[in-house]
Amino acid sequence: RSPFAIAAQLIVLVRPMLPIMLAAIVMGVIGHFCATFITIFGGFALLTAAGLPSPLAGVGTAFACILVFALLRGVLRYAEQASNHYIAFKLLALIRDKVFGALRRLTPAKLEGRDRGDLISLITADIEQLEVFYAHTISPVCIAILCVTGMTCFTASYHILPALVLLAGYLLVGIALPVWSARRGDKAAREYRQALADTNSYLLESLRGLRDILQYQNTAARAEGITAHSETLGEKQKALKYREGLTVAITNTLILFTVIAVLGVSLQLYRNGQMGVEGVLI
């Protein structure tokens, strides 16, 4: 099945807790706007202090707004994360119940097979990864779409060109880079997953055959095998972490270049008389 089909099937499980998810999205959007407008109010304060046109009455008003928005940001962030993790852990409990129900029908015959390491990985690591999906993917994607739309429109209220540059940066960081990273890292992720399953299977075989290992004095060879599996798993994990680090570095670089590009376009528009100094500053 395609990743989109799997994601759609996982999203369906959220339906009973849809009100909580919607609340998390609303709080996330408001919270991100609060965080963004903290710096914008700082810009308004500078405009007011310099005697330039500003939507605020005075510098004191700007600082009061900054304080209120900072407090709101903290409260809303906490509430958003609490809602997302409540949904995630409730659904993880539901999924684990379904998995263990299926295992009860399969055991003990299924655990005698060579793929029992896959089952252990499924019960532990794989299900834990769903916490990232439910707590840090569904609502953040919705929040990102709404915030990108809002900030692009806000920037366009000063001039359309910096808004288009900003939108291009959003699309690069939010869509193009994740798709590229996922395609490049797919092989490494699958290799790590297989190495983890192989290690689990080897450890289970060692535990189940511990009496025979001791009887035939095969402990040294078995220990070397465990070490070899652990080293292989470590190498696969290292490759995966390298790709994660590379993605983070590229993300930060794109964000920096986007900021510089927006500033450069705004300065050029200011020189041409198409944008005021307040637009450049904000």
What are these regions (language model features)?
Residues P3, A35-G43, L67-E112, R116, ...:
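Juxtamembrane helix-loop junctions of ABC transporter transmembrane domains
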Residues A62-R77, Y170-L172, E244-T258, V277-I282:
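Hydrophobic alpha-helical segments in the permease module
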Residues F44, T48, R105, A156, ...:
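Transmembrane helix-loop junction
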Residues V12-P19, P108-A109, A125-Y134, I138, ...:
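An intracellular "coupling" helix at the cytosolic face of ABC transporter transmembrane type-1 domains
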Residues R1-A35, P55-A62, E80-N84, A88, ...:
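Membrane-integrated ABC transporters
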Residues M21-L76, A156-L161, N272-E278:
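Transmembrane helix-loop-helix hairpins at lipid-water interfaces of multipass membrane proteins
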Residues P16, I20-G31, H136-E191, A261-V277:
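Transmembrane helices of ABC transporter permease
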